[in-house]
Amino acid sequence: MRMSTAHLSILAAIAAFLPLTVASGAAAEALKPFKDELFSDQTVIESHDNGAFQTIDYQEMRDINGRDQISEKRVKPAYVETGVRWKAQQDETLPLGDRKLDVTRIGPASGQAFTVIFIHGRGGDRRLGSNDYTFGGNFNRLKNLAYNNGGTYYAPSVKSFDSNGVADIAALIRYSYQQSGGKPVILTCASMGSFVCWGITRDAESVKRLKGMAILSGVTDPDFTKSAFYKAKLPVWFTHGSKDPVYAAADQESLFEKLYKARYPTRFTLFATGNHGTPVRMTDWREVLNWILDPQPS
């Protein structure tokens, strides 16, 4: 049917009031760029499995010493935009049923287009995931990507990495999902925090509310294929340093290969010569979030 100019004008007006594309699960360009020239310009030195596995050129002298004003403590000003902290950041204690959880929230408390939750590792708390200047400014980028695209980012303080910690995050997932009106929730976990991610994969009620997951420098779950998350075929992206002395990259690579061969939606980014903290510094959040929101087959 031929559309008149009036029809097109009406459609354009309707589109202007629709939610962001991330809410409808569209396209790899769902999130608008934020400092991509500084964070996304990474050199792929090896790739296989149709590009699902990529090895990235990582160099400590360039990616830490060349990027930080004070090594590992304060990134150079060009890498951050701190206005988001004053406009949209709030420390709060959420009452979640019979639980209470300390979080830093960036973005709206309700009606968000999507939610990202980051779980820190041992010795961390909500301050780690909301610090603008450490880890090369990568959390500041995550905060801005969420806020600038109508989303909400939560950095909770996880008191333990056992069933109690899993229950706390399950409650946060449920809360975020309800507050947004059923929009996508993405769970991301670093280091020992990955115990929480793997625990959540076994919770069928949480899995119903999740869009996908990212594991940074995490442990491997040999029973992942028995989980509700696996059965739902939700996407998972791994990032790891090749010289991680805490959790061996080879273990996660083995799990990735098993998933990939089963045609499971998965990606793996390996940072050549990278250490345990490298993925928290170097993970390209825009690439990871866009793919989880709309995973492309290999």
Residue map of PLM features:
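N-terminal cap/lid segment of alpha/beta-hydrolase-fold proteins
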Residues: D57-S110
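Short, surface-exposed "cap/lid" segments of acyl-processing enzymes
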Residues: G97-L145
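Conserved alpha/beta-hydrolase
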Residues: F139-F161
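Alpha/beta-hydrolase active-site loop
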Residues: K159-S180
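Short beta-strand/loop motif that positions the catalytic acidic residue
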Residues: A232, W237-H240, D244
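Short alpha-helix in the alpha/beta-hydrolase fold that links the catalytic acid
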Residues: A248-K258
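C-terminal catalytic histidine-bearing segment of alpha/beta-hydrolase fold enzymes
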Residues: P265-S298
